[in-house]
Amino acid sequence: MKTLRESLLLFPLILCADLSYQDRAEKLFHDLEVVREIDQAINKQLPYLFTDFGMVGYFTMPSARMPKAGRFGFGFAKAPPYDIWSLSAQLFDHLETVGSYSIYRGILEWNFGHLGFGDDADRSASAKLGLLRREDGFPYLPNFSLGWIDFLGSKRFNSFFVAATQEFIWADVEATLGWGCGRIKGFYGGLAWSPWNWLTFAAEYDANNYKKHSWEHPLGRKVRSRINVGAQARLWNLFTVSVHSLRGEKVATSASIHYDLGKTEGLFPKVYDPPVYQTEPAGRLRTHEELAQELAVAFKEQGFDLYSAYLTPQGKGLDSLWLKVINVRYREEDTVRTRIEHLLAYQIPDTISHVTAVVEADGVPVHEYRFRLVDLMRYRNGILSNAEFQVIAPLHNASSSPSSYESAHLYQRRRPICIFTFRPRLLTFFGSSTGKFKAQTGFTLSAEGYPFDLCYYFIQGSFTLFSQIQNLRSVDILNPSRIINVRTDGLLYHQAHSFHLDQAYLQRSWHLGQGWFTRIAAGYFETAYGGVAAETLLYPVHSHWAIGFEGAVVWKRNYYGLGFTNKIRKITPNGLTHVPFTGFQYFVDFYYDYKPLNLDFRFRVGQFLARDKGIRLEGGRTFLSGLRLGLWWTFTNAKDMINNHRYYDKGISLTMPLDLFMNQSSRTRIGTSLAAWLRDCGARAYTGKELYQTIFWERYNQHPLFY
């Protein structure tokens, strides 16, 4: 009876508590919904519109807006009387860059259009600098930018502009007011409405000075209306198509693709990457040799190769273990570290007090990890976090293997003697007098390895299947190079035979200690040159800088066969001649890596291949995806003239991880480079695998604990 009475008394309390719990739960979900709505309001943005030449704007006029860093685009526009190809890259949140190629339809190029080049064309580079963006935390202020259109080369469409764009998120509307000088003359404006995220209607006031601009196409000068109206549609948040009126005379269309290559994790998930190691440790009863074999198998499963293992007595029944490991799969140092930490934490028995793991790449001991067993156990048990473990056990400069008199050599594996690689090859040639674009396709077959573990060798041959370059001239008709032709005769090598031995060289590298590295190389370094080279580099662990010294003696290869020549081509006012030549190039290299923005710089000072002296400036940014976009500009004392202006070698480069297109991780990188002109000033011969590039990419960490 008493129990029933107590239950009846407790029932109201339980009921009230339950109702209170439900109220709190409902309030929690309500608060979470409010937070979600606030986040959506903060992150909501209007769709981006792109001009015919590839810059964020409307149809012909740029706006002040720009996407986040890492977004790349490629497009084509038919804007009568022009056909425009464009390539855009958002290097930083506040810097948009665009390269475009405009074809004057119906206007024959006046110098060599009749030779096959066809219609006149112009290359241009444009940039926009964002001074104030809505994403900077000023949602009620307009975006404000200034920009330069076609600021390099012949500058046929050159303009400077300033623009302010206000976004009315609540109404899905944006409005722009801008002013420009050059081809854009005076004030302009734009208005866009996006009733749906995939469709935008827009109108603009076109301020281009079509009538009086000197480089304007004759068929593009007539203007009936300066109001251009049209629409842009986005498909799958990837493709953009646009239709709009132009000058009140024509209808222009464009199509482009835009993708965030900077942050992508790849087209496929890395389903074939093994999980981090979590297996029972080797016990005390196993012999040391069995331990080494277990480690070799475990490292292999994780994507590493174990090449050496030494055991050194430390006293009191404890030993230290020294390992040499080669990373064959992963492209970021923190991934390598995490997997090695897990493997050692689960595999090392309690009879070993310390473990040293040296990581080697391309025959160079790059750095090492030093772990105490007590720290590995604490990490395994979740007492130490990744960040804490990095503080306790940071990277160190690589050490040499222990003495055989003091240590037991448990395991040794030789590097592979021969690895074959088959790849397709595409060579492109732009701006030939007989055509705007020419190509040569084929394949390459290469072999590389470490015979007897003494040095590295690389041999590559190429075979041409299809070529459009057999009738191309190797001399610029309008602007022939007046210095020795160290590069401008390169076309002749590809016209020689269907099969060619591109490279065949030996290289040996050493780590001298305390962050000093050196290498020597000899052989056929590239299609055009062979010789001997040496390099020394100071690049300590945890350093943002490095300094290197390099030099090479190279000889010119014959256009046919494997022989060399001591003559090189030179074009003089009296005609073509050949002069004695032995190539000497030497440089002092300064490197700097700015971690907060993943920027890297190189300043190369010395003598280049054409005996010109000067400096080559290089810079690049690596995005979260591993894609790197770089620029270079060379200033030397060579007097190379193009269109009566002194030319300095410059261009862009692009490299990216191959695993962006794979379902497993890979260290391999692919890339290309494009110079503004193929000239001889600021040229250098390839001399083998550079030390800095090998070490930089092996130590590369997208999210370092310390800057």
Residue ranges: model-predicted function:
Residues 64-69, 132-142, 169-173, 198, ...:
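Short loop/turn motifs that connect adjacent beta-strands in outer-membrane beta-barrel proteins
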Residues 10-18:
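Hydrophobic h-region of N-terminal signal peptides that target proteins for export
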Residues 73-75, 86, 96-98, 126, ...:
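Residue-level detector of the transmembrane beta-barrel scaffold of outer-membrane proteins
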Residues 2-10, 545:
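Sec-dependent signal peptide recognition
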Residues 271-275, 374-379, 383-388, 394-397, ...:
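Gram-negative and organellar
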Residues 19-42, 213-215, 232-311, 317, ...:
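Flexible, glycine-rich linker and terminal segments associated
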Residues 104-126, 130, 135-137, 147-151, ...:
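Outer-membrane beta-barrel translocator/channel fold
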Residues 18-152, 168-170, 195-199, 204, ...:
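Transmembrane beta-barrel domains of Gram-negative outer membranes and organellar outer membranes
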